[in-house]
Amino acid sequence: MLSCNICGETVNSEPDMKAHLIVHMENEIICPFCKLSGINYNEICFHIETVHFEQNAPEKNSEKLAAVQYGHSDRKNTNLQSTAEVTSGIHSACASSFPKESSESLPKDRTVKHEAFYTENITESRKYQKSREKKPGLSEAQGSIYETTYSPPECPFCGKIEGCSQDMEIHVKTKHASLLESPLKDCHQPLYDCPMCGLVCTNYHILQEHVDLHLEESSFQQGMDRVQCSSDRELAHRLQQEEDRKRKSEESRQEREEFQKLQRQYGLDNSGGYKQQQLRHMELEVNRGRMHPSEFHSRKADMLESIAIGIDDGKTKTSGIIEALHRYYQNTATDVRCVWLSTVVDHFHSSFGDKGWGCGYRNFQMLLSSLLQSDVYGDCLKGMAVPCIPKIQSMIEDAWNEGFDPQGASQLNNKLQGTKAWIGACEIYTLLTSLRVKCRIIDFHKSTGPLGTHPRLFEWILNYYSSETEGTPKIVCTSKPPIYLQHQGHSRTVVGIEEKKNRTLCLLVFDPGCPSREMQKLLKQDMEASSLRQLRKSVGNLKHKQYQIVAVEGVLSPEEKVARKQASQVFTAEKIP
């Protein structure tokens, strides 16, 4: 009876013990270099020859194989004991020979590569064994472990078959040396870290190829970034162009609307002038039943006749107001210390034909009505009558054609007839100067008192009317004509100024917006103070940002007229303050 030194089991014969030990070896054998287990003896031999050929010299390997496989049958106990010792020696070699630091010194990917390599070797060994088993005519001895181990080896990498193990070893070392690098104890092989990702390479050339891949990828990414950046810039440029186009289109639209609004406001929208507006209003009155058709035709005929001869028909005129004011201040006004009145002047109010834009023309009619009643201006205004509005427009165009105020003419397109264009202080000055009437423009361009008031304006008008008066009578009828007063959007005519007993000043103003029925209330004999409310304007009533006045001061000589025409090429006004 034979007893197994490994597990204690007893067997009857040496072949049974040998088979029993082989079972132990197949189940328990472990690679002494890398601790690979779970494979049979033939597989572990093939594994050691191919993977650990540098650590396992041929002669040592032969001794191990002989110790395990070539024991004599006569030395039963000794062989079994030796076999057990070899087996335990193999186990101890696996524990002592495998470097403890190897797993730590190698990167994880190197370990993965070796495991894959071991699995491949084992697979190849098993394939070789199966092919041997399938060949017919082989005896049991020929299929033994010796023949499997020393049969013509095949390269596990490229499949080449060599005549012996030494030739295969040389082949693997020379052809597949880079694949057989394994961790060795106390091995100081230089390693190369990738500067871009930290990968450890065992060969400088491999590192160079690896870094080149990084650079190619970076270059490709940069190229893609440049393409993307270029595409983004192009898209941004297109969006900016579209935004600029829309903004310019919107600005152009707003500019056109504002320009058209200004054209309508100043009567330059080609919608007709005085004549067309008068006819439209009269037709509207007929349609509403406020005017009989016969009256429409009668008034139309009168209007056409007035335009044809160039003289105002007088239907909007109110005369005698200055005389009525003189009577009032003489008999009734007890709160007034002194009053200065201009020369006689007629009031003209707007009609259907010039409503909304004709205040400047109506104020010129008032001023001219005063000048025509003065002998001082008889020479320069000889044979004139108060003109109608279309005639005044024609007279201003004639003054422009003479060379007066070219800048103002260009702003109005050198045309007033047939339009509803407003006129202001510059046009009044131009027209009077062309008629040889001496006048001046004074610009009160900013307020000179609290709350936006203009006390300097009142002081200037007081000095204008009181300059030729000695003493302080209550009522002073001066020889000074009325003053044209302009502010933004409207104009009026100053016909006098009164000083209260408390020394406050109040202007007396004719407004072309006031209808004749209101002005005629001033002609009553028993006129009340409340009737003057529409004429009186205190300092607190004039709070526009800017005021301009045109004051008449006499007659120009022909030479002075030429000089003033030359000066009007660059029009300037006197500024106060």
UniProtKB/Swiss-Prot annotation:
Q: Where in this protein does the record put region Disordered?
A: 124-145, 238-260
Q: Where is the composition biased (Basic and acidic residues)?
A: 124-137
Q: Where is this site: Involved in the stabilization of negative charge on the oxyanion by the formation of the oxyanion hole?
A: 486
Q: What keywords are assigned to this protein?
A: Acetylation, Cytoplasm, Hydrolase, Metal-binding, Nucleus, Repeat, Zinc, Zinc-finger
Residue numbers spanned by region zUBD/ZHA: 248-273
Q: Where is it localised?
A: Cytoplasm; Nucleus
* Stored InterPro entries: UfSP1/2_DUB_cat, Zinc_finger/UBP_domain, Znf_C2H2_type
Name the PROSITE patterns on file: ZINC_FINGER_C2H2_1, ZINC_FINGER_C2H2_2
Query: Domain of life here?
Result: Eukaryota
Mapped zinc finger ranges (C2H2-type): 2-24, 29-52, 153-176, 192-214
Function of the protein: Deubiquitinase with endodeubiquitinase activity that specifically interacts with and cleaves 'Lys-63'-linked long polyubiquitin chains. Shows only weak activity against 'Lys-11' and 'Lys-48'-linked chains. Plays an important role in genome stability pathways, functioning to prevent spontaneous DNA damage and also promote cellular survival in response to exogenous DNA damage. Modulates the ubiquitination status of replication protein A (RPA) complex proteins in response to replication stress.
- Name the record gives this protein: Zinc finger-containing ubiquitin peptidase 1
